[in-house]
Amino acid sequence: MDTAITATAAGLPATAHFPSEPDKVRSFFDFLDAAPTTERNYTKALKRFFSWLAENGIKNPTDSHIRAYKKHLMATVKPGSVHLYLTALRLFFRWTFDQRLYPNIADHIKAPRTGRSHSRDSLTPGQAHLVLDTAKAHERDGLSGLKLYAIALLMLTGGPRCIEVSRANIADIRQADGHRVLYVQGKGHAEADRPINLTEEADAAIRAYLTARRAKPDEPLFTSDSNNNRGERMTSDAVSRTIKGLFRECGIDSPRLTAHSTRHTAATIASQSGNAIEDVSCFLGHADLSTTMIYDHAVSRTTSRCEQSVQNAIFSARY
């Protein structure tokens, strides 16, 4: 099935050509209005597809080419990546059709099912304790060490994502129900509205870091120490590298243990520490309980003790 026939059948000009020009791709992302992380991932997905087309001498792809590309992906990347790349293609070709630029040749391509289990492992309480003790020992190194301990303690007891840590501002820390709470901008949210209760230790670690930094109230919570962008907001990639480096320092080095493992660790320990599944769901900021059972909107996040129970379990464990 050639492109001209496909285009004519779709009610588009028979001369329709594949819109791979940078300005067309930019228009797609402007239309999509996606979060920066999503745009970055979809950009990577489209670049990979465009490269595959070029390598195979394909100028105007058809649905048969999409099927061939799917087979190529399934043979070369992980199922989760296949799902991401095909999702990006489906959205892109839906847009090209809506804009009368090119037929929607990816509409019927299904992504492979991915397993329900997490692609990342969690630390044991003992390993988490070792990580925190190692991070705390760096406090004597000055500002960078104070930041390291504050980030590690926040992520292991509160379970925020790297992007949530990066987006956090000092002004997002407020009082609620008698204690300090950090409100983070969760996945798919336009503002910082998901509360993470700060344990006394996490609050003290953050205060110590901010005091040493001489931080102002309108600044990001965590800033870069790099000579290239010192004082600027710490990126999510930098947060991820920081935690991964800490793991390696502790002798904990596995492809399945990444910075996101701190979130799985906090969730696992919270569940094992006897917290109600509804509390754990709210603790993680899930929109529903598809991953943690049935969501209960009546649960009050700021009165939950998930963070404290996670910290207690970590510091009582041996390594």
Predicted segment positions?
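Conserved catalytic core of the tyrosine transesterase superfamily
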Residues: 1-319
